[in-house]
C-alpha cells in the first residue's frame, strides 16, 4: 500500500532586528510526499511561474558508505549513470537532455549522498520519469569493462584538475586523514584514491550499485509546473516494478577524534603564498549545536569588525582574507579556519594572531546586533535558495534524505532563528577553546621555514604520468548484456506532453535627466529584489602603465562612505539582510545589490551613498593593494590562470588593453596611488554611460521614485571610451607553449580572434558551435575527448564577444601524457566538422536551442542578464523571438559556411601550458611547425 503525506508547509520568518515595521512575508512551500511499496520516496512541489520542471533523484550514498581499499565508488557512479541505460541507449540521459531542451543536467557526490538533477520543459516530464527509473532498474548491466576503463580515466582527469594540478590541492586530504581515524567513513576524500579506482573490478562496481542504488535508499523530487495526479500515475508506471533492496542500516554518529594537536607541513609545487589551516572536530548536520557553530564562524570572519579581520588583516597586516566555515555532514562535522598569508609571512605569526582573536572573542562574546545581522543575512539567503524550481527541489530532497521529512525546513529555520549569544559562546567553549586540532602549513617549494614551528612533513603519494602508461580501451564497443525484464516495453520513449508556452518577462524602460537608463522586470515569485548599475568603461579607460586602477577603484568604493566607516556601512547593510558590492571588468564597473523587497529603499540608499560619497580611506587603499598583489601572486601558481592570461595576449596582442589582467600586474599595482583612483572616479564614473537594471518584487513606480534624486545628485560628464581594435585571425596556425614543470595536466587554449556580440554572425555562429563544443555532453569535443578517449574531465568551445570583437576558444585540461594526442584529435574534429555536419546534428541543435527557451528566464539572475543584453547591445525586449527564427531557419549549408569561416584549424592560435620537458618537442607533430616557448623556467620544481 502506498503511503501518502500531504503537507502545506507554512513558515513564518520572524527576525526582530528588521528596521522596518512591515510584516515579514509568509513563505509557503507546498509539497506532497508518497512512498511506493518498494520504498521509494517521491516528493511533488507545484510552481506555475514558468513552464518547467526540476527533476532530482537523490541516492543516500556517498563516500562515507565506501570501505578502505574501495574508495571513489560513489563518485564514480555520478559519472557512470549519465552514460547509458538499457532503454535510453548509449549516451543515455545526456543525449536525451539535449533533445528535450534540458538545462543543468548534472550530478554531485558528497560524503553522504549522490544526486542527479536537471530542469526540463514541462512537456518532457514523463520522459524524465522514464529516464530516472531506467537509472535505478535498467542501468547496471550496461557497465562493461571498456566502459569502466574509460570512466576511470575521466575521474583521474577530474582529480588532476581539482587536486593534483592546483595550489593547496592536497590540503583537505591531509586534514581529513588526520582528523578522522583510519576506520572512520570520512577518513578519505570523496573522489577517492586513484590506486583504489584503478584496482576496482567490474564485479566490485556492480556489487556497490546493487547495494546502495535501490528504491528504499532513494528520493525522487518533481518540482515545478506539474499535474500531481498525472505525475503520480507515471511514477507508479515506471518505478513500481523496481525491486526493493536490502534494508539499509543508518551510519552511527561519530565525531572526528584528535588525541593531541597535530601540526603538519607540505611544500606545494603550485603554491606561491603560505596557507595555514586549523581544523577542530565538531557536531554533525542538524545537531542542535550546528546552528550556533554556523553563527560562530560567520561572526569571527565576516565584516570589518570581525575579530579575525581586525587582528590579522587590519592590525597585523598578515593577510587580506580569512576564511572560516562550519562544515556539517551526516556523521560528523568540522570547523575549518584558513588564512592565506602574504608573501614570505611566517605562519607562526599568523597562528599567534589567531590566538589573539580567539582571546578577544572570549572576552567580548558576540553582540546582539551582530547576531541579528547574521540572522537577517540567513533570511535573505534562504529566499535566494528558493528562487528556482531546482533550488526548491534540492532542499526538499535533502531534508527527506537526511531526516525523512521534506518539511524539516520548519524546524531548520526555527533552530536558526533561536540561536542566542550564549549558545555561540557555549559552542566555542565546547568545541574550540583549548581543544585539540589539526594544523596544516602549505608553503611554496623550498619554503619550509615559513611553516609552523615543530610541524612534521606530510607525506603525499603523487601520481607519476608516463607516456603510454594508461590502460587501453575501445569506447566504441557496443556493450552486450542480458536485458532486465519488465512488464512492458520500456524501449519506447514516452511522447511529449502539451507544448509549453515560454513566458517572456514584460520589460519596462525609463531614462533620467542625467542620462541614466533604467530597465526593469517585476516578478513576485519570492520577496526579493536584485539590481545592478553598469557603468561603461571598466579597464578600457585605464592607461597601460596604471593597469588595475579600475579594479582598485571598484574595491575601494565598497570601503565606507563620507559619513560611514567601513564597519558602519557593513553593519547597515547586514542589518537589512542585504548586500551591496562593486566589481570591475574589461568593459565596465558594476554595482550589484540584493535585498528583501521590504528593505529595497533602505538598501538602495546605502548603495547610492557608496556611489556618490566615497570615503577614500588611505588605510583601506593600502590593504586593497596588498590583496591585489597577493591574488596576482597566487594566479602565477594556477595553471588555468597562467594559461588564460597568456592566451589573451596572443589573441589581442600585448598593446591591446583587452589582453591584460583586470587586476593589473604586480608592478603596476605597486605604482598606483589613491590619487589615480580619484582621477578615474572623477573622469569615468558617470550616468551618461550607465544603465540600471532591477528585477524582483517591486513595481516600476517604486523604482523610479527611489532614484529620482539621482538626476540632481549624480551629474553627467562626457566620457570617451577608447577603441581597441581586435586583430584579424592569423593567416596560419602556430603552436605556443608555456612551461609549467611537472604539471600533471596540460591546459589547452586553441582559438582565434572572432566576432563582437552585435555582429550579424554572432548568434548564428553560436548555433553552429552547439554540436562542436557548446552543447556539453551533446558536443563532439566532449563525446570524443572525454567519452571516447578519457583524455579530459571537461572540454568546451565558445564565442565570447562584447561591444568589440572577441574570440573563438576551445579550452580544456588534458592528461599531460596525451597533450599531443588530444590536440591532434581536436584538429581532426575541427577539420571535418563542417563537412560531416548532418541533419541529425541540426535537429539536435534546433531541438535544444528552441525548447530550452521555456526556462531561459526562470531565475532572477537570468532576468538580470536579459536586461543587460537589452541595454548593452540595443536588443529588442523580445529578442529571443528573433533568435528563435534564426534557429528555425538554420540549414546545413549555413552551418558549413560558418564553420569554414570561424573555426578553421589552419588559422588558429594553439596554446599549451604544461610540462615542456616531456611535451614541448612532441607538439611539432601537430603539423604547425616548431612550437614557440613563451617562458623559461627559473626555478626547477622538485620531483
Residue map of PLM features:
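Proteolytic maturation boundary segments
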Residues: 17-41, 227-268, 275, 309-310, ...
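M16 family metallopeptidases and their MPP-like homologs
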Residues: 45, 50-66, 72-76, 91-138, ...
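Non-catalytic, conformational "gating/processing" segments within enzyme and secreted inhibitor domains
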Residues: 145, 152, 206-237, 436, ...
Amino acid at each position: 500500500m502506498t503511503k501518502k503525506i500531504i503537507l502545506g508547509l507554512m513558515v513564518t520568518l520572524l527576525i526582530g532586528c528588521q528596521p522596518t515595521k512591515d510584516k515579514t512575508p509568509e513563505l509557503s512551500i507546498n509539497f506532497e510526499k508518497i512512498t511506493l511499496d518498494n520504498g521509494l520516496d517521491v516528493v511533488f512541489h507545484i510552481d506555475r511561474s514558468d513552464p518547467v520542471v526540476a527533476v532530482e533523484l537523490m541516492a543516500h550514498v556517498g563516500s562515507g558508505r565506501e570501505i578502505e581499499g574501495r574508495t571513489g565508488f560513489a563518485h564514480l557512479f555520478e559519472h557512470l549513470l549519465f552514460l547509458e541505460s538499457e532503454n535510453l541507449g548509449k549516451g543515455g540521459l545526456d543525449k536525451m537532455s539535449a533533445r528535450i531542451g534540458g538545462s543543468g543536467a548534472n550530478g554531485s557526490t558528497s560524503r553522504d549522498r549522490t544526486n542527479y538533477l536537471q530542469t526540463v520543459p514541462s512537456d518532457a516530464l514523463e520522459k524524465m520519469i522514464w529516464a530516472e527509473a531506467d537509472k535505478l532498474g535498467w542501468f547496471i548491466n550496461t557497465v562493461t569493462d571498456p566502459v569502466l576503463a574509460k570512466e576511470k580515466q575521466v575521474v583521474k582527469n577530474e582529480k588532476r584538475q581539482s587536486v593534483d594540478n592546483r595550489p593547496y590541492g592536497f590540503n583537505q586530504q591531509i586534514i581529513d586523514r588526520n582528523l578522522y581515524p583510519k576506520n572512520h567513513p570520512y577518513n578519505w576524500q570523496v573522489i577517492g584514491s586513484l590506486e583504489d579506482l584503478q584496482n576496482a573490478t567490474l564485479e566490485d562496481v556492480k556489487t556497490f550499485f546493487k547495494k546502495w542504488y535501490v528504491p528504499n535508499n532513494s528520493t525522487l523530487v518533481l518540482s515545478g509546473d506539474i499535474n500531481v495526479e498525472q505525475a503520480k500515475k507515471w511514477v507508479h508506471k515506471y518505478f513500481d516494478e523496481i525491486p526493493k533492496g536490502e534494508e539499509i542500516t543508518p551510519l552511527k554518529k561519530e565525531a572526528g577524534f584528535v588525541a593531541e594537536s597535530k601540526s603538519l607541513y607540505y611544500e606545494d609545487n603550485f603554491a606561491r603564498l603560505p596557507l595555514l589551516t586549523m581544523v577542530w572536530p565538531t557536531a554533525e548536520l542538524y545537531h542542535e549545536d550546528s546552528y550556533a557553530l554556523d553563527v560562530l564562524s560567520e561572526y569571527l570572519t565576516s565584516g570589518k569588525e570581525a575579530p579575525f579581520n581586525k587582528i590579522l588583516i587590519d592590525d597585523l597586516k598578515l593577510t587580506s582574507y580569512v576564511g572560516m566555515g562550519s562544515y556539517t555532514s551526516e556523521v560528523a562535522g568540522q570547523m575549518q579556519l584558513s588564512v592565506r598569508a602574504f608573501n614570505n609571512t611566517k605562519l607562526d605569526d599568523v597562528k599567534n594572531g589567531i590566538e589573539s582573536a580567539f582571546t578577544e572573542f572570549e572576552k567580548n562574546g558576540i553582540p546582539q546586533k551582530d547576531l541579528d545581522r547574521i540572522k537577517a543575512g540567513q533570511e535573505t539567503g534562504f529566499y535566494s535558495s528558493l528562487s528556482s524550481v531546482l533550488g526548491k527541489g534540492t532542499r526538499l530532497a535533502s531534508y527527506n534524505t537526511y531526516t525523512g521529512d521534506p518539511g524539516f525546513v520548519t524546524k531548520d529555520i526555527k533552530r536558526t532563528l533561536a540561536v542566542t549569544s550564549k549558545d555561540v559562546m557555549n559552542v566555542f567553549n565546547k568545541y574550540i577553546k583549548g581543544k585539540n586540532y589539526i594544523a596544516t602549513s602549505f608553503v611554496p617549494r623550498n619554503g619550509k621555514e615559513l611553516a609552523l614551528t615543530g610541524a612534521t612533513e606530510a607525506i603525499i603519494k603523487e601520481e607519476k604520468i608516463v607516456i603510454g602508461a594508461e590502460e587501453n580501451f575501445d569506447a566504441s564497443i557496443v556493450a552486450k548484456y542480458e536485458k532486465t525484464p519488465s512488464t512492458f516495453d520500456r524501449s519506447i520513449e514516452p511522447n511529449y506532453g502539451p507544448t509549453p508556452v515560454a513566458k517572456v518577462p514584460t520589460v519596462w524602460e525609463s531614462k533620467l535627466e542625467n542620462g541614466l537608463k533604467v530597465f526593469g522586470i517585476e516578478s513576485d515569485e519570492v520577496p526579493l529584489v536584485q539590481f545592478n548599475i553598469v557603468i561603461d568603461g571598466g579597464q578600457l579607460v585605464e592607461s597601460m602603465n596604471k593597469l588595475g586602477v579600475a579594479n582598485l577603484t571598484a574595491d575601494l568604493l565598497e570601503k565606507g562612505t563620507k559619513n560611514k566607516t567601513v564597519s558602519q556601512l557593513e553593519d547597515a547593510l547586514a542589518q537589512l539582510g542585504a548586500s551591496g558590492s562593486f566589481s570591475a571588468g574589461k568593459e565596465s564597473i558594476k554595482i550589484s545589490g540584493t535585498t528583501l523587497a521590504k528593505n529595497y529603499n533602505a538598501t538602495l540608499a546605502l548603495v547610492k551613498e557608496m556611489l556618490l560619497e566615497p570615503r577614500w580611506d588611505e588605510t583601506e587603499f593600502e590593504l586593497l593593494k596588498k590583496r591585489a598583489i597577493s591574488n596576482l601572486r597566487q594566479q602565477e601558481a594556477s595553471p588555468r590562470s597562467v594559461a588564460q592570461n597568456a592566451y589573451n595576449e596572443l589573441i589581442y596582442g600585448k598593446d591591446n588593453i583587452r589582453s591584460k589582467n583586470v587586476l593589473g600586474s604586480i608592478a603596476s599595482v605597486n605604482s598606483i596611488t589613491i590619487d589615480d583612483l580619484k582621477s578615474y572616479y572623477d573622469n569615468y564614473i558617470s550616468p551618461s554611460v550607465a544603465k540600471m537594471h532591477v528585477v524582483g518584487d517591486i513595481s516600476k513606480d517604486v523604482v523610479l521614485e527611489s532614484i529620482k534624486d539621482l538626476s540632481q545628485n549624480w551629474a553627467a560628464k562626457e566620457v570617451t571610451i577608447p577603441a581597441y581594435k581586435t586583430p584579424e585571425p592569423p593567416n596560419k596556425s602556430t603552436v605556443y607553449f608555456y612551461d609549467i614543470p611537472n604539471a600533471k595536466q596540460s591546459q589547452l587554449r586553441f582559438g582565434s580572434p572572432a566576432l563582437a556580440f552585435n555582429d550579424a554572425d554572432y548568434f548564428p555562429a553560436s548555433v553552429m558551435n552547439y554540436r562542436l563544443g557548446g552543447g556539453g555532453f551533446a558536443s563532439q569535443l566532449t563525446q570524443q575527448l572525454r567519452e571516447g578517449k578519457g583524455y579530459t574531465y571537461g572540454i568546451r568551445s565558445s564565442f565570447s564577444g562584447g561591444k568589440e570583437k572577441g574570440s573563438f576558444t576551445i579550452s580544456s585540461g588534458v592528461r599531460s601524457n596525451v597533450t599531443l594526442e588530444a590536440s591532434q584529435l581536436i584538429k581532426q574534429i575541427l577539420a571535418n566538422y563542417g563537412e560531416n555536419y548532418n541533419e541529425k546534428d541540426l535537429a539536435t541543435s534546433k531541438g535544444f536551442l528552441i525548447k530550452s527557451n521555456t526556462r531561459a528566464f526562470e531565475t532572477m539572475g537570468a532576468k538580470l542578464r536579459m536586461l543587460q543584453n537589452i541595454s548593452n547591445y540595443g536588443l529588442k525586449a523580445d529578442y529571443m523571438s528573433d533568435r528563435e527564427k534564426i534557429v528555425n531557419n538554420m540549414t546545413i549549408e549555413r552551418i558549413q559556411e560558418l564553420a569554414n569561416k570561424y573555426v578553421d584549424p589552419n588559422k588558429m592560435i594553439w596554446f599549451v601550458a604544461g610540462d615542456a620537458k616531456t611535451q614541448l618537442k612532441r607538439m611539432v607533430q601537430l603539423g604547425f611547425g616548431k612550437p614557440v616557448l613563451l617562458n623559461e623556467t627559473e626555478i626547477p620544481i622538485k620531483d
